[in-house]
């Protein structure tokens, strides 16, 4: 086996040199039989080229790379000169697209540092390494086109949302999301039986993919692992806002910037008070049935909605009425976490208070009322603080980063003196 550097075993090159010498003799014999001046010039040109090429090949057999002779193309130099593969591994592995000739390449070469191994490499019997492209899935380094192509595999053909595990496919391999599958009688793609075979391989791939938020078209720039995607979307500040008024009569949805305009245009009866401390006066609290009282409070360049809701509790033993008071911010949950509200009932040396973080209108007040995560009291307690059927609630809203105001009668540990 020959050495690519020409350090020994140059039999291949000697054969080529001998062939070129014979060609040179043929050129000289042809030129001796010619007496024309033009052929003589041609003879000199061929003779010089042949001598130069022979000298270059001799130099290369001694370890010097041959230059391309004038008048002869690189392709002509390749004829009969392709060396055998070296027995010793190269110092650097290259991903080559083209033909290797005398230690050079005729096309683009992408080199890797010595000792490194490219991704997905396989070695053939001739010692040539073939390299398959490594495409990152949904992570840094993947192009937008490749990421979009991979994500398209997870699109449900019915709702066009991204499917989350578990993945169920039909006998033909067609997928449908878990939300749409119970509503289908057959596969929406091939009309075969409803997808019922679990695709475990796709679930493993999904663990490496970052899925965009459902509301990315509305401006959300975040991507998530499939396990965190649903939780984020429930509180994403880019999701459509529902009408914050209690009750199910208004089905409006829109952007955050449109909420106040909707309230002023559709719910004109709602009163807005300015300031951090106001009195929320609910009139006619003795009205039968379920009743809601709503008021707006504007401060710190934000708008808050105050809700007092009365519900009938149909207990066969003792029917009662319950009141629930809560404050929600016209904004996101992240913004709501910057504030604290305080509700207080006081009359005849009695006082009842509640302090908490405002609810975001994304969260609504339904869950807070169901869990009694608000100021809750029954009709008997309401009568203790009401006057002529009207109930006044003191509402104070404070920023968390500012000292909160205290009631004059409240004492803290710092106010106590010890002997």
From Swiss-Prot:
Gene Ontology annotations of biological process type: programmed cell death involved in cell development; proteasome-mediated ubiquitin-dependent protein catabolic process; protein ubiquitination
Keyword Metal-binding applies: yes
Zinc finger (RING-type): 156-191
Keyword Hydrolase: no
Gene Ontology, cellular component aspect: cytoplasm
Superkingdom: Eukaryota
EC top class named in words: transferase
EC number: 2.3.2.27
Binding-site list for Zn(2+) 1: 213, 220, 232, 236
Residues that bind Zn(2+) 2: 243, 250, 262, 267
Reaction it catalyzes: S-ubiquitinyl-[E2 ubiquitin-conjugating enzyme]-L-cysteine + [acceptor protein]-L-lysine = [E2 ubiquitin-conjugating enzyme]-L-cysteine + N(6)-ubiquitinyl-[acceptor protein]-L-lysine
Pathway entry: Protein modification; protein ubiquitination
General function of this protein: E3 ubiquitin-protein ligase that mediates ubiquitination and subsequent proteasomal degradation of target proteins. E3 ubiquitin ligases accept ubiquitin from an E2 ubiquitin-conjugating enzyme in the form of a thioester and then directly transfers the ubiquitin to targeted substrates. It probably triggers the ubiquitin-mediated degradation of different substrates.
PANTHER family documented for this protein: E3 UBIQUITIN-PROTEIN LIGASE SIAH2, E3 UBIQUITIN-PROTEIN LIGASE SINA-RELATED
Domains (record comment): The RING-type zinc finger domain is essential for ubiquitin ligase activity. The SBD domain (substrate-binding domain) mediates the homodimerization and the interaction with substrate proteins. It is related to the TRAF family.
Subunit structure as annotated in this protein's UniProt entry: Interacts with tir-1.
Protein name: E3 ubiquitin-protein ligase siah-1
Gene it is expressed from: siah-1
